[in-house]
UniProtKB/Swiss-Prot annotation:
UniProt family annotation: Belongs to the bacterial ribosomal protein bS20 family.
Protein name: Small ribosomal subunit protein bS20
PANTHER family to which the protein is assigned, alphabetical: 30S RIBOSOMAL PROTEIN S20, SMALL RIBOSOMAL SUBUNIT PROTEIN BS20C
Keyword set includes Repeat: no
Annotated organism of origin: Hamiltonella defensa subsp. Acyrthosiphon pisum (strain 5AT)
Entry's Gene Ontology molecular function annotations: small ribosomal subunit rRNA binding; structural constituent of ribosome
GO CC annotation: cytosol; small ribosomal subunit
Length: 109
């Protein structure tokens, strides 16, 4: 433990900030996990709702420096891609179950 009064104060402040940041970081991780859980369950509407709740929180904490801005962007990008892929997969499954074969349009050469 520090002997100087200002060093003691800084140690107390540092510990207080560490605990606060740990709880905020945990909250961000929880919101991200909720989106992944909704995606894995296959419920697109729940995934979109969870993503809409997660996005402003992850942006806010990236601006404040709690997580890196590139990490926030990476999570948003990956989750958006997975949510968008859910609709394509469900469309293919629906058409196959109806007996229709879905073919992507051919690109002109």
């Amino acid at each position: 433990m520090a002997n100087i009064k200002s060093a003691k104060k800084r140690a107390i402040q540092s510990e207080k900030r560490r605990k606060h940041n740990a709880s905020r970081r945990s909250m961000v991780r929880t919101f991200i996990k909720k989106v992944y859980a909704a995606i894995s369950s296959g419920d697109k509407k729940a995934a979109e709702t969870a993503f809409a709740q997660m996005q402003p929180i992850i942006d806010r904490h990236a601006c404040k420096g709690l997580i890196h801005k590139n990490k926030a962007a990476r999570h948003k990008s990956n989750l958006t891609a997975q949510i968008n892929a859910m609709s394509e997969d469900s469309l293919l499954k629906k058409r196959r179950s109806e007996g229709c074969e879905f073919k992507a349009p051919e690109k002109p050469v």
